[in-house]
Amino acid sequence: MKIQQNISLMEKLTILSDAAKYDVACTSSGVDRGGDGIGLGNSISCGICHTFSADGRCVSLLKILFTNECIFNCSYCQNNCNSDVRRAAFTPEEVCELTMEFYRRNYIEGLFLSSGIMVSPNYTMELLYQTLYKLRTAHHFNGYIHVKAIPGADPLLIEKTGFLADRMSINLELPTADSLKKLAPCKSRNTILKPMRMVQNGITENKNEVALYRHAPKFVPAGQSTQMIIGATPENDYQIVSIAENLYQKFDLKRVFYSAFVNVTHNSNLPALPGGPPLLREHRLYQADWLLRYYKFKADELLSPERPDFNIFLDPKCDWAIRHLEYFPVEINRADYDMLLRVPGIGYKSASRIVKARRHSTLDFANLKKIGVVLKRALYFITCSGRMMYRTKLEEDYICRNLMGDKTQIPREIRESGYKQLSLFDTQLSTEGLLLS
C-alpha cells in the first residue's frame, strides 16, 4: 500500500472524493445536473454532495477524505489496507486551497472532511486539526465544517478540533459489538463510544460556558452524529432502531445515519446481495428514525422481538396505525397534539397548524387540505365534527389494501431499481452482478 507521488491536485480530488462516497454525511438531494459548457455551475463536480439543513434548505458540501490510506483491514471498507485501489493523500494546505476555491466559485457552502487512518489515529487527527486550524485562521473560512473524529486519537486533539468544527461525528460502523469484532477486529466498541461520550460532555459544558460568557468559543455547535452500515451483519430492524434510540437518549446525538451495505470488497465474511444494496430497508429505518426524533414514538411501539422487521409495503407510521385501530378515528377538533402526531398523513408542522387554527374556528377537510395534511392517508383515521371524509371501513384489511395502492409508500428510485426483500445471509448465492455503486 503506497500513496502515489507526484500526482496532480485534480487527480487527488478525483481519488479522494470517490473514496468518500460511502461516508454518509446526509441524505442525497438527487441532483445530477452537470455543466453544459455554456452556462455556469455544475452540481456533480468532483467531491460535491448535497445535504439538507433543519429548515429544508439544500446545502452543497465539498465531501472528501484527507487520505484513503488506512492501517486497518475492515472487511466492508473499500479503503482497507489490503484493497487494491489507488492511494492518495492531501496536505492541509491543499484541502484549504480546494475549499476556498470551490467556495469562491459558489460551488459549495461547507466542507465534509473524513479520512482513512494513516500511520496512527493521533497522526491522522493531528492532520485534520491542522487543516481546520488553517482554514479558520489563515484563510478566515467561516463556512460550515463537518469533520470525522478518529477513534483512538488523543482526547485533547479531538477537543481542539471540536472548537473549529460545526459538527463532529464518530462512526459506530456496525450496530453491535459482536458484528464489529467479526468484520473490523482492529476496532472496538469502547474505542468508538469513548470519544462520543467526550464530545457529548464537551458540548454540555460549552453550552454552560456560552450562557455565562457570550463570546466564549463554541464547541461542536451543530452537535454530533454517527453512522451505521445496514445489511452487512444479521441484526434485525428492531435491534437497529433500539440502538439508535439509545444513542439519542444516552449520547444526545443530533442524527444517526444509516448506510445500505454495498459489497465492494467481496470478502467471504460478507453476505451476498444479488438484489443489490437493501435500499428500501435503509429508507424504512430513516422513516422510523424520524418518528423517534420528531413524533415521540418509541422503538418498542414500532417493532418488537416477535415482529422484528418493518413492513416493506407500508411506512412505519401507517403500519403502526393499522395495528392500533383502537385509537382511531381521531377527532381533529379535539385531539391533543401528541395524538395528532400519530395520525398518518399529519406531520409535526401540520399538527401545530391544526392546534393553532382550531382556536379560531372549527376545522373541516377543506381546511386540513390547505394546512398541508395528506388526506389520501389521513382520511381513514380522522373525523371532522364527528364525520369521516368518505364512508370508509375501520378495518385493518380494507385500510391496508388501500394504503398499499399508494405508490408514495415506496420511493420511485427504489421501485425502479427492481428492489425486492431477500434473505440477507444466503452466502451460497453467486456474487456476480452485484451493484457496486
Question: What is each model feature region?
Answer:
Residues M1-E69, V374, I382, Y390-S437:
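Flexible, acidic/Gly-rich N-terminal and inter-domain linker regions that tether
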Residues N269-L341, R377-S430, L436-S437:
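Long, highly charged, low-complexity intrinsically disordered interaction regions
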Residues C96, V119-L302:
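Conserved AdoMet/S-adenosylmethionine-binding subsite of the radical SAM
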Residues I64-E93:
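Canonical Radical SAM [4Fe-4S] cluster-binding loop centered on the CxxxCxxC motif
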